[in-house]
């Protein structure tokens, strides 16, 4: 690595040390998609990005191991995650199935009422023709004209009833879908509460941390890009941390960590990485629970696109559940090496 890149790396490390929490750093290092998004936002050359990742692995390892009490807490998180995740996974899979079944039911009723409305409209048209025909023939064929007139009016009434019935059926179905979504929301409250109480005061703002992860990643990348440009163009000014952009969302309550820039950067051990992943898994679980049970759009009003909303939520929930399953596999005994 050339001397200029070494200076850049030191500046980057200072920024991560001062402005990025341990949880954010661990998630960035354990999520390849997040890392690639960060590298793209920061506009880092590949060799520089690789060196930075090695240095950040060492920094993260130091942050994880520095506080033994915190390390013990991570071990507790790991054990809790291993114990509770299978049950939570079954519950979440059940919610995914219910969301998809509900979406399918909403779609079927919507298709059925649409077809029925088409039929009722056709009947209504026929009613109009027969009624007009009956009125037109009245002066010439009294008996037949009254039959046609009565038939036309009867069909018209039937069509009106059919149209109203279809509208009522679809409305009732949507209201029921809304109620079921509300029940999902309420049934998940206790699970979310238990998980949040377990994590406790050690992880403030955890939902915000996960919900805003994409924005956080992009923000970190933009700040690193600004640092790089400032270093490459001294006239832009020296590096100054921009705390108002990212802030420090940290379970350690703002604990400052020792600067690690000396010596060759070494990769963090798999054992240390997955211990941190346990805490990250719990944070993501909170986000998954929130995603599964929060039904704002449905509760604000079930519209024709409510089935798509349900499908989208189920798909997003399934993707995050798959990621959590991978973390659970990483945390299995014998995977520390």
Curated annotation (Swiss-Prot):
InterPro entries: ApoL. One of its GO terms (molecular function) is lipid binding. Widely expressed; the highest levels are found in lung, thymus, pancreas, placenta, adult brain and prostate; also detected in spleen, liver, kidney, colon, small intestine, uterus, spinal cord, adrenal gland, salivary gland, trachea, mammary gland, skeletal muscle, testis and fetal brain and liver. Its main location: cytoplasm. It is found in: Cytoplasm. The modification N-acetylmethionine is found at residue 1. One of its GO terms (cellular component) is endoplasmic reticulum membrane. The modification Phosphoserine is found at residue 250. GO terms for biological process: acute-phase response; cholesterol metabolic process; lipid metabolic process; lipid transport; lipoprotein metabolic process; maternal process involved in female pregnancy. Keywords: Acetylation, Cytoplasm, Lipid transport, Phosphoprotein, Transport. May affect the movement of lipids in the cytoplasm or allow the binding of lipids to organelles. PANTHER family: APOLIPOPROTEIN L, APOLIPOPROTEIN L2. Belongs to the apolipoprotein L family. This is Apolipoprotein L2.
